[in-house]
């Protein structure tokens, strides 16, 4: 399936797992809530999907890349405790709380959200000492002797063996306890996301002309050459910033993100043409309604890729203006709602309290900032990347 369908399925699963019956108990008992296992090549957006699902479902998110952990941080540190069993005292080994479990409780405390998603990435690439712990985690939803809190949905992700030499295959016993989703790169689906995320229009128009260059992983005698969706998105962010600073991105820089020499060379040449068309056609003048007659004459004779580039430039310019307008409207609406609530509160304030209005207004601001920060900690605030002026 593609990443969009996977996102929808995860979102539906979270809602189903967190649904409660008339007695306030989870409709699907925790023991029947199978963890979701996403399997797919690197860089296709698995982590971003989890952030979107958590935000849209209004739950917290704790994400870990498990290859960054040791058995001690995942399970906890051992310590000796004295116990009385039968008729004698004995020393037994217990463990401190898992760092991962502790981070869930810390997230709950920081955000005020008791339900959430625990996302474990690269779960099938762990070290030999941690592999049994991950199997226990998927099968029993525990780290050591500590269970994942109720109300937390487990989602794990891994890479197929052809993309990672460290991959460990799961046995049938484990696979029979998870919901496996195999994800494949899908350019049309990614373009929907890219437009919403304001991916640089040069990248979008280039991939429109060369869809085969969206995602490739090739191995030869010179090593592995690859380009991923993550690489295109990160390059887009850099191009935006470079344009703002008046800097030029060359092929060497592009190779740092697009680690496929032929594709990097091809895109670098396209990007040079893209900027040339922007200057030659005077995109800002066109958007201002001051297009020169020569522009129309040239456009009639232009090849298809040149016309497509110009359309992308114009759409990027319009996108910048539309987004700025939407952001201004959102700020105005938020200010209006805040002032309306403040006015209601002022109406209930006794008149004989000196400086009461100023104190109330100050407290309203503090409460608003605290609420906003709590939502930010819970990743419930949608912060769409601001598009730069690419025209």
Language-model features: locations:
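AAA+ P-loop NTPase catalytic core and its hallmark functional loops
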Residues: 1-205
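Alpha-helical transmembrane segments and their juxtamembrane interfaces
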Residues: 131-132, 238, 377
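Conserved small/polar residues in nucleotide/adenosyl-binding loops
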Residues: 382-391
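General alpha-helical segment detector with a strong preference for membrane-spanning helices
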Residues: 163, 232-234, 390
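Alpha-helical lid/collar subdomain of P-loop NTPases
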Residues: 196-344
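Long intrinsically disordered, low-complexity regions that are acidic and Ser/Thr-rich
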Residues: 346-377
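Active-site catalytic microenvironments for nucleophilic, acid-base chemistry
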Residues: 56, 140, 238-241, 386
